[in-house]
Amino acid sequence: MVSRYVPDMGDLIWVDFDPTKGSEQAGHRPAVVLSPFMYNNKTGMCLCVPCTTQSKGYPFEVVLSGQERDGVALADQVKSIAWRARGATKKGTVAPEELQLIKAKINVLIG
């Protein structure tokens, strides 16, 4: 039996965000998974935030360290994606402190 990857909370995945509209992050890029394994496995969906190497110093950026390239997670661009259909693959894992900071910044937006 072939083991298939299922994203888990805190995973850094590589995924295709196209198609997009307006100022949404587009193209193949990393994203931080926010939803737990059980939800992601059952639904084929996951909540995530896209990442970019182009930091602009916005208050909702979270710096990610220990990855292949320096970058930031965009905590104000939470997305629900069909990770199976978009061919998500695991790229790494973010530090627990970084995941908590992303969640804290999202909480500021949604209260």
Swiss-Prot record:
The modification ADP-ribosylarginine is found at R4. (Microbial infection) ADP-ribosylated by enterobacteria phage T4. One of its GO terms (cellular component) is protein-containing complex. One of its GO terms (biological process) is regulation of growth. Residues 53-61 are annotated as: Loop 2, involved in substrate recognition. Induction: Expressed in exponentially growing cells. Induction has been reported to occur after amino acid starvation in a ppGpp-independent fashion and to be Lon protease-dependent, but also to not occur after amino acid starvation and to be regulated by ppGpp. Also induced in M9 minimal medium and by chloramphenicol treatment. MazE alone and in combination with MazF, represses transcription of the mazE-mazF operon. Fis activates transcription. Part of the relA-mazE-mazF-mazG operon, there is also a second mazE-mazF specific promoter which is negatively autoregulated. It comes from the Bacteria. Its EC number is 3.1.27.-. (Microbial infection) RNA cleavage activity is reduced when ADP-ribosylated. Keywords: ADP-ribosylation, Antiviral defense, DNA-binding, Endonuclease, Hydrolase, Nuclease, Quorum sensing, Repressor, RNA-binding, Stress response, Toxin-antitoxin system, Transcription, Transcription regulation, Translation regulation. It is an enzyme of class 3 (hydrolase). Can be used to produce large quantities of a single protein if the gene coding for the protein does not contain any ACA codons. Up to 90% of expressed bacterial cellular protein can be the target, which can be produced for up to 4 days. The system also works in eukaryotic cells. Gene3D superfamilies: 2.30.30.110. Residues 17-28 are annotated as: Loop 1, participates in catalytic activity. Loop 1 (residues 17-28) effects catalytic activity while recognition of the ACA cleavage site is influenced by loop 2 (residues 53-61). Alterations of loop 2 generate new cleavage sites in addition to retaining the original cleavage site. Probably a dimer. Forms a heterohexamer composed of alternating toxin and antitoxin homodimers MazF(2)-MazE(2)-MazF(2). The binding site of MazE and ssRNA or ssDNA are largely overlapping; the presence of only 1 MazE molecule inhibits mRNA endoribonuclease activity. Binds to EDF but not a mutated EDF (NNGNN). PANTHER family: ENDORIBONUCLEASE MAZF-RELATED, ENDORIBONUCLEASE TOXIN CHPB-RELATED. Belongs to the PemK/MazF family. Toxic component of a type II toxin-antitoxin (TA) system. A sequence-specific endoribonuclease it inhibits protein synthesis by cleaving mRNA and inducing bacterial stasis. It is stable, single-strand specific with mRNA cleavage independent of the ribosome, although translation enhances cleavage for some mRNAs. Cleavage occurs at the 5'-end of ACA sequences, yielding a 2',3'-cyclic phosphate and a free 5'-OH, although cleavage can also occur on the 3'-end of the first A. This is Endoribonuclease toxin MazF. The gene is mazF.
